[in-house]
Amino acid sequence: MQKQPLWQRSRREVSRLNPAHRVNIAEVAATAGVSVGTVSRVLNESPNVSEKTRGRVMEVMKRLNYRPSRSAESLSRGQTRTVVILVPFLTRPSVAERLAGAIGVLDEEGFDSVVRNVESADQRDRHLAALTARHEADGAVVVSLRLSDSRLADLRTAGVPLAMVDAEAPGVPCTVVDDIRGGSLATEHLLALGHRRIGFIGDSPDDDLGFISTRRRLLGYRRTLARHRISYDPAIVRLGPHSASVAASMARDLLGLPEPPTAIFAASDTQALGVLAAAEKSGHSVPDDLSVVGYDDIESAAQLGLSTVHQPLGESGACGASRLCALIRGQLVRPLREELPLSMVTRTSSAMYAVAGVA
């Protein structure tokens, strides 16, 4: 009796020594007597396979009860099912919330997330160069980082799909907020409470990563003062490295002035927390002696009663990731610029000027 060809045997016959074994693409290829590439082309419905071979491979897949894994399908399409997320200073609460939003969407879409922390321009450029030099991911989400024209050109040439969050670049889908308006919201809130001497604490303008959020929030602050015919006073503006401890030091400096501000607008909640700590240490009651407003509305802001400008951090990360997934699927993303709304959240750290006990 002639021996039955291997490719015509059932899965039970092929896998009887290990009933729990899941058949993979290599076993299909070996059983059908073809290469893995041929099986991949059959899965991908390529026309470059003869009908006879296609039929044999399909018969083997049926007999072995083969079910393509997600990774096998991805490889057949030249995909890694991986997305790189570039974020600056991962430990910052606002960054962590954006990141969580992005990872949640990517996970639902079946992508693994590779997070690259960036703390210098050199780090940023190395990670971007890796994206263009080798196909390590199907695309990238860039959070709060500015990209040079040359780096953008490299990414486009390499065909790397890209979406940005809290940053913009020509021709790239981006998810942003209007930080000028945000600065205005915070300043208007304090002016409505009767404050006229409002200090400002924010980031240094000369960081090598090119962050622009503080500059835009400061611009909103200045424009709002001008609309109310209040002169901008650089003596009550302090800019420095982004941290609660540095902000606390700058706040102590402001509170020690002969004419200290009655309110301080901090360009981030992290910096506002430093202001609150400095006020407590120097014996200034918040909000009786000093009103404080932050920006971001991170999770701890509500717990501490911090008045702040709310921006949808998690939603922004999710939106950026969703737009990238659309690009990877080959869909047209419009509009390129998605602006999310801001709102002023009033809590116990801000109060009327008269209530603050200043005559």
What are these regions (language model features)?
Residues 1-81, 354-359:
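N-terminal helix-turn-helix DNA-binding module of bacterial transcription factors
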Residues 51, 55, 64-129, 136-139, ...:
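Amphipathic helical "hinge" segments at domain boundaries
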